[in-house]
Structures are given as C-alpha cells and as structure tokens.
Swiss-Prot record:
Subcellular location per the Swiss-Prot or TrEMBL entry: Endoplasmic reticulum membrane
Transmembrane segments: 231-251
Designated name of the protein: Vesicle transport protein USE1
CDD domains for the chain: SNARE_USE1
Family statement drawn from the similarity comment of this UniProt entry: Belongs to the USE1 family.
InterPro entries according to UniProt: Vesicle_transport_protein_Use1
Extracellular compartment segments: 252-258
Primary gene name: use1
Function of the molecule: SNARE that may be involved in targeting and fusion of Golgi-derived retrograde transport vesicles with the ER.
The species this protein was found in: Danio rerio
Length: 258
C-alpha cells in the first residue's frame, strides 16, 4: 500500500519534533509543545484515515507520540529527582522514524534526557553539600561568640532536635517493620489462597472421578435392568407356550363326549 500524504506529513513533523527534543532548549521555548500538540491531532486523523498504515506501524507511531508528550511533562516537574524518575518510565520508539537514522531518534532523545537529569541532580547535590557545610561552619562560629546562657539554650535546642530526630528514626523503623509485617501477611495470604486453590482443584478432580464412576455404575445398572426384563419376557413366553401346548394335548387325548 502506498504511503498517503497525511502519513508523509506526520512522519516529517514527528522527525522535526524528535530533532527539537534532542536539542538543548530554553524554558521559554514553545515550539516543541505546539508541534507535539499538532502531531497528536495528525495521529488521530491518521488512525481514522481510509489509507491508514498497518497496526504495527500505528502502534510505533503512538509510542513515539506518547514518549514526546511524557518528555514534555517530565521537563515541567520542579526537581531534578522528579524529572529523573519520570524519565525512567518513558518508553521510546523501537524503529527509526526516517530511513537515514541508524538508531531510533527517540531512543537517543531518551538517553540525552536521562543524562541531563543526572547532571542536574549532581549539581543540586554538590550545591546543597557546599551550602550545608557553610551553614554548619557559620553556626559553630556563631555559637562560640554567644554568652553562656545562650550556649545553654542552644544545647537544649540541640537536645530537642536530637529527640525529634530519634523519634523520626523510630517512626521510620516502625513503618519499616509494618511494611515487613504487611509483606509477610501478604505472602501468608498468598500461600493460603494457593493451598485453597490446590484443595479446590483436587476436590474438582475427585468430583470428576466420582461422576465417571457414577456414570459407569448407572450404565451397568441399566444393562442389568434390560437383562432382567429380557429374562422375564422369555419366561412369560415359555409359560404361555407351555400352556398352549398342554391345552392342545389335553384336547387331543380327551375328546369331547357325545
């Protein structure tokens, strides 16, 4: 089947979107989002077209459109950690969009996006580490310059903070134990359900065996009943025949008196 004009335009726009997604864009860049919106509309029209491509091709097109939409949504997330997590769930296309591609462009975009998120997370961790060190050093200097009463208040505050920290650790341990207990209960429930299923399967098998035995016994009784009826009919036939012959002989042996 020849490629329709709508599919050709869709592939061109898809290739353009993948090219824009692979570039480093400013936060005010709006073209990719508009292009992806138009791409989604064209894909809906392509699915309804009489000369639509094969189901496998449509599935790959849909996968690439969903990947671009998910990529845009991931870039709007506030923190690098959230962006990285969202990127992990993205599924790029499996085939090249145009014939000149050796590797699918969406896979390349996915790798670049994950690398950018990792770099942003690294920068954030380094900056937070430097700022925390500076804050700690300033706090120590400030405490050394405080009077005795204020130092004592700071020590009490540290104790309160340590107490809250211990409570948080205890709460985390309790939640971990609760999760473990929940997991153990789930596994136990699964084992019970599995055993019940096995028992039910065995009961069904036993019921099938009993049904077959009952069927065999019913057939045997039916055959026995048929034999009994046949014997009774033969017996009646013999009795009737004997009676008839006896009457004939009696008439012949003792003729009627005149």
């Amino acid at each position: 089947m020849a490629t329709s004009r709508l599919e050709i335009n869709f592939v061109r726009l898809l290739s353009r979107c993948e090219s824009l997604a692979s570039e480093k864009r400013a936060e005010t860049e709006w073209r990719l989002e508009k292009y992806v919106g138009a791409l989604e509309e064209m894909f809906v029209a392509l699915k309804k077209s009489p000369s639509k491509p094969t189901p496998e091709t449509l599935t790959d097109y849909n996968r690439k459109v969903d990947f671009l939409k998910g990529l845009l949504e991931a870039e709007k997330l506030p923190s690098p950690a959230e962006k990285s997590l969202a990127n992990q769930f993205l599924a790029p296309g499996r085939t090249p969009t145009i014939s000149s591609e050796r590797t699918p462009a969406s896979k390349t975009v996915h790798i670049q996006s994950k690398a950018r998120c990792a770099g942003e997370m690294r920068k954030e961790l380094m900056s937070s580490g430097v700022s925390n060190s500076a804050l700690l050093e300033n706090d120590l200097r400030h405490r050394k310059s405080l009077p005795v009463d204020e130092r004592q208040s700071a020590a009490e505050l540290d104790q309160i903070l340590q107490h809250h920290h211990n409570l948080q650790e205890k709460l985390a341990d309790d939640m971990l134990n609760l999760a473990r207990n929940l997991k153990n209960n789930t596994l136990a429930a699964q084992n019970i359900i599995k055993q019940d299923n096995q028992t039910l399967t065995q009961s069904m098998r036993q019921a099938d065996v009993n049904f077959e035995k009952l069927k065999t016994e019913s057939e045997r009784l039916e055959q026995h009943a048929k034999k009994s009826v046949n014997w009774f009919l033969w017996l009646m036939l013999i009795v009737v025949s004997f009676t008839f012959i006896s009457m004939i002989l009696f008439i012949r042996l003792f003729p009627r008196l005149r």
